């Protein structure tokens, strides 16, 4: 009487939620957040590294980011990487630091960010549905092999479906929250 590992399914669904949270955290809203610079990578010491491995990122003011670069020789590379990151940011070099003013988001940019958030949520939902499918396939196989009975298979299948529904509604809730945050002027 085994069936499938419901804890493994829950863990994988939680992983999809965490990946989604990480994706939407990097979307720029009206407020400054150090996460905005998460997608920025720098050519440093012979490889591409995330910005947070060569500098401290701070939020000194609501519409300003500060980047304190540890290695003076990296200032130009960091400046270039931020400018080329398609985030629409223009850093101001101040010695070994960069100040990055965050411009107001116009309506068009807000709508495109909401669209990107929807794409991230769809990607997360697809991942969750794959986990559900794997679980259901495991149940069918276990039932076919005689490892579990039809009743237990149905019971576990209902649990997997409930987990799926709960996880997808959590994604929808997080998306609605982020959408509201982006559209707020």
Curated annotation (Swiss-Prot):
GO terms for biological process: cytoplasmic translational termination. It comes from the Bacteria. Its main location: cytoplasm. CDD domains: RRF. It comes from Agrobacterium fabrum (strain C58 / ATCC 33970) (Agrobacterium tumefaciens (strain C58)). InterPro entries: Ribosome_recyc_fac, Ribosome_recyc_fac_dom, RRF_sf. It is found in: Cytoplasm. HAMAP family: RRF. Responsible for the release of ribosomes from messenger RNA at the termination of protein biosynthesis. May increase the efficiency of translation by recycling ribosomes from one round of translation to another. Gene3D superfamilies: 3.30.1360.40, Ribosome-recycling factor (1.10.132.20). Pfam families: RRF. Keywords: Cytoplasm, Protein biosynthesis. This is Ribosome-recycling factor. SUPFAM superfamilies: Ribosome recycling factor, RRF. One of its GO terms (cellular component) is cytosol. Belongs to the RRF family. One of its GO terms (molecular function) is ribosomal large subunit binding.
């Amino acid at each position: 009487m085994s069936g499938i590992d419901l804890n493994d399914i829950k863990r994988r669904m939680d992983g999809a939620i965490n990946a989604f949270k990480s994706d939407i955290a990097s979307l720029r809203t009206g407020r400054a957040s150090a996460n905005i610079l998460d997608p920025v990578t720098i050519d440093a010491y012979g490889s591409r590294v995330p910005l947070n491995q060569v500098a401290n990122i701070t939020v000194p003011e609501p519409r300003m980011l500060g980047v304190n670069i540890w290695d003076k020789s990296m200032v130009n590379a960091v400046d270039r990487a931020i400018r080329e990151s398609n985030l629409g940011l223009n850093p101001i070099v101040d010695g070994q630091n960069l100040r990055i003013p965050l411009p107001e988001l116009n309506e068009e940019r807000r709508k495109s960010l909401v669209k990107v958030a929807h794409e991230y949520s769809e990607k997360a939902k697809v991942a969750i549905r794959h986990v559900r499918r794997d679980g259901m396939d495991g149940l069918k196989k276990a039932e076919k092999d005689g490892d579990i009975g039809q009743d237990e298979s149905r019971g576990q299948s209902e649990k997997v479906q409930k987990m799926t529904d709960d996880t997808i509604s959590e994604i929808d809730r997080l998306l609605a929250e982020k959408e509201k945050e982006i559209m707020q002027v």
